[in-house]
């Protein structure tokens, strides 16, 4: 992002859900975070305070992907900046949002990102994996082929890692 001084404004537009451009701002935010996730770190309190209020699926998908970016940087890459910035409260809100997105009617991409985020969060928060498995198994037969593929993949990983029982 050539002008990081506008990041605050971009985030502000993402969470002005009454505006018809909020979802477009969320798309741009996703692209910016793919390139410079560290720009979001000073704003995580605000991000996680407002993310539960976003309901439009066009905005939820990019926000769920940003949650996945944060979770991967925290749990897989162990990025020191993300490890310092992402608090337990942030992770709790992230888990709540991801579970909400799994049990409400969302697009498959959002559901897939949510499953992956919860899989990663479950390595630290022990109650997540059993709940995630239950939700996936309850929904797998009536959801799309993309949901089924991601659900089988996540359950397979949890079983392989001996995080859940068959």
Label every model-predicted segment.
Residues 8-19, 45-55, 96-106, 130-143:
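HEAT/HEAT-like alpha-solenoid repeats
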Residues 99-120:
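A charged, amphipathic interaction segment
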Residues 22, 56, 60-63, 111, ...:
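Residue-level detector of extended alpha-helical repeat arrays and alpha-solenoid scaffolds
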Residues 1-38:
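N-terminal interaction modules that seed assembly of large macromolecular complexes
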Residues 28-34, 63-76, 113-123, 155-164:
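Hydrophobic residues within the alpha-helices of tandem HEAT/HEAT-like
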Residues 38-91:
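Helix-adjacent hinge/juxtasegments
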Residues 133-166:
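Eukaryotic acidic, Ser/Thr-rich intrinsically disordered low-complexity regions
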Residues 39-40, 127-130:
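Structural helix-adjacent loops and short alpha-helical linkers that scaffold large soluble proteins
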């Amino acid at each position: 992002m050539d002008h990081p001084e506008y990041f605050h404004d971009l985030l502000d537009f993402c969470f002005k859900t009454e505006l018809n451009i909020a979802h477009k701002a969320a798309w741009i935010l996703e692209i910016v975070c793919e390139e410079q996730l560290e720009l979001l770190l000073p704003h995580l309190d605000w991000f996680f305070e407002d993310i539960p209020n976003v309901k439009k699926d066009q905005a939820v998908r990019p926000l769920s992907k940003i949650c996945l970016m944060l979770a991967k940087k925290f749990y897989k890459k162990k990025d020191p900046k993300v490890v310092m910035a992402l608090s337990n409260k942030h992770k709790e809100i992230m888990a709540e949002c991801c579970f909400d997105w799994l049990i409400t009617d969302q697009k498959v991409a959002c559901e897939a990102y949510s499953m992956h985020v919860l899989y990663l969060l479950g390595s630290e928060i022990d109650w997540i994996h059993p709940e995630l498995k239950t939700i996936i198994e309850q929904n797998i037969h009536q959801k799309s082929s993309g949901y089924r593929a991601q659900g089988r993949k996540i359950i397979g990983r949890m079983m392989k890692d001996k995080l859940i029982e068959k």
